[in-house]
């Protein structure tokens, strides 16, 4: 299976620096194509410098750094680069962001899910986040009816047949009034998933922690804690438990 990691980056090098440190420690990174999509900003030079240092440190030979010629924004930036990666022939793509810390086994998790659930079209996405308790079992996976945008992955057939065509690219989807539960992530979670009976697979113990207290649409009040997150997780033999609603 041809797998890729998409990291979208904007103007927060103070978040990006520890996030790249975390990704540098991730096992199996060398097996994934990496695309870093950088939005233009006043600190784009500093951001690209951090990415270049990450590439030198990891020695990863399959990394492309794409500086968007114009700012695409939070709707278009992930869409454009996800679509490009699938069009280039990748079978499974994980999307990460510049303010999301990850565990060192996160790609082992995604590699397992990508293979195990490839033939289950109702599993639309794979997630790294969980709000589970601190003592959650790192090996356990569960199905969920909700979509979570904090480091997630999907397959090419799900993208081309469903997620791409239904992506909210202009805030035209909403619940009740414009601006309420709108955007691509809300659209997937509150409309696309329930209307089509779709779900996701996620770990009980989170493999991601959001450190982005300040962002395009983020405030400290928006952060959901991840008490089960650990930076270092031994290699697991993953297993699925019952469905979580």
State each model region's role.
Residues 1-96, 100-245:
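Peripheral/terminal regions associated with large enzymatic or DNA-binding modules
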């Amino acid at each position: 299976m041809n797998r890729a990691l998409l990291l979208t980056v904007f103007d927060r090098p103070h978040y990006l620096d520890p996030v790249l440190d975390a990704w540098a420690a991730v096992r199996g990174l060398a097996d994934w194509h990496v695309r870093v999509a950088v939005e233009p900003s006043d600190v784009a030079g500093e951001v690209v410098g951090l990415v270049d240092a990450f590439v030198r440190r990891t020695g990863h030979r399959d990394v492309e750094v794409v500086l968007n010629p114009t700012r695409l924004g939070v709707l278009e930036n992930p869409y454009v680069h996800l679509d490009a990666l699938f069009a280039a022939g990748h079978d499974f793509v994980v999307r990460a962001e510049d303010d999301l810390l990850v565990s060192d086994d996160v790609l082992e998790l995604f590699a397992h899910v990508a293979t195990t659930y490839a033939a289950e079209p109702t599993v639309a996405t794979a997630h790294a986040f969980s709000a589970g308790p601190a003592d959650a079992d790192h090996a356990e996976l569960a199905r969920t009816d909700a979509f979570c945008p904090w480091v997630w992955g999907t397959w090419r057939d799900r993208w081309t047949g469903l997620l791409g065509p239904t992506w909210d690219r202009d805030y035209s989807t909403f619940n009740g009034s414009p601006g309420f539960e709108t955007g691509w992530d809300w659209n997937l979670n509150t409309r696309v998933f329930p209307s089509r009976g779709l779900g996701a697979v996620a770990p009980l113990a989170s493999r991601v922690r959001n450190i982005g207290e300040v962002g395009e649409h983020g405030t400290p009040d928006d952060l959901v804690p991840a008490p089960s997150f650990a930076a270092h997780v031994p290699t697991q033999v993953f297993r699925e438990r019952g469905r979580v609603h």
